[in-house]
């Protein structure tokens, strides 16, 4: 690299090293209008909120701060909760990305629903029926904020190997009198396509 020449237009390496050490290059993200005055910004925001509140009071003749009607062109009447449509008093829906865990079903960490067998008079001795395990809603909602595994559409598989779509034949089936005892696996054949003549 001794043959490399630095042109006169570019600064020498010594000058670049000195400049980087003393004065770092300003970042690409710059404040175009100077530093932010947070006190002035807070005052402007409070003034804007007051102006909006006063405009709403004049428009609807209602004091939204004290929840009382004012004199004006509208006549406010108090009504019973039962006479209103449900959407006026029901709690708001959670945001779309929020975690939903049903209260009736408990899930393990991988998202599989747990099931318990029925005990006592409800259970049959020949075949055991499985039901979803019911949990207390207060127990279930205490940890909603901390852990949100999400609900899986299908349960997680226990085995790590993917399922093979080919029809596997076990060795005991092969030795049961099949003509080709050497092959362990057989690919199923598609039936021939039937063409309709019109």
Swiss-Prot record:
Superkingdom of source: Eukaryota
Region (Disordered): 1-22, 87-198
Residue(s) carrying Phosphotyrosine: 74, 88-89
Modified residues (Phosphothreonine): 157, 170, 187, 198
Annotated Basic and acidic residues bias: 126-137
Keywords assigned by UniProt, alphabetized: Cell cycle, Cytoplasm, Endosome, Nucleus, Phosphoprotein, Protein kinase inhibitor, Ubl conjugation
Record's comment on post-translational modification: Phosphorylated; phosphorylation occurs on serine, threonine and tyrosine residues. Phosphorylation on Ser-10 is the major site of phosphorylation in resting cells, takes place at the G(0)-G(1) phase and leads to protein stability. Phosphorylation on other sites is greatly enhanced by mitogens, growth factors, cMYC and in certain cancer cell lines. The phosphorylated form found in the cytoplasm is inactivate. Phosphorylation on Thr-198 is required for interaction with 14-3-3 proteins. Phosphorylation on Thr-187, by CDK1 and CDK2 leads to protein ubiquitination and proteasomal degradation.
GO annotation (BP), single: sensory perception of sound
Similarity comment: family membership: Belongs to the CDI family.
Protein name: Cyclin-dependent kinase inhibitor 1B
Organism: Felis catus
Taxonomic placement: Eukaryota, Metazoa, Chordata, Craniata, Vertebrata
């Amino acid at each position: 690299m001794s043959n490399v020449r630095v042109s006169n237009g570019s600064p020498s390496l010594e000058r670049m090293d000195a400049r980087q050490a003393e004065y770092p290059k300003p970042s690409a993200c710059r404040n175009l209008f100077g530093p932010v005055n947070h006190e002035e910004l807070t005052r402007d925001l409070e003034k804007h909120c007051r102006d909006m509140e006063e405009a709403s009071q004049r428009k609807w003749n209602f004091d939204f701060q004290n929840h009382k009607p004012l004199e004006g062109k509208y006549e406010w009447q108090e009504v019973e909760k039962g006479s209103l449509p449900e959407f006026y008093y029901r709690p708001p829906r959670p945001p779309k990305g929020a975690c939903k865990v049903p209260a009736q079903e408990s899930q393990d960490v991988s998202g599989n629903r747990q099931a318990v067998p029925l005990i006592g008079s409800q259970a049959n001795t020949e075949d055991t029926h499985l039901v979803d395990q019911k949990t207390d809603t207060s127990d279930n909602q205490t940890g909603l904020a901390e852990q949100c595994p999400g609900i899986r559409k299908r349960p997680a598989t226990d085995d790590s190997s993917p399922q093979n779509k080919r029809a596997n034949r076990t060795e005991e089936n092969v030795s049961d009198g099949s003509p080709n005892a050497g092959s362990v696996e057989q690919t199923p054949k598609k039936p021939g396509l039937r063409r309709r003549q019109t």
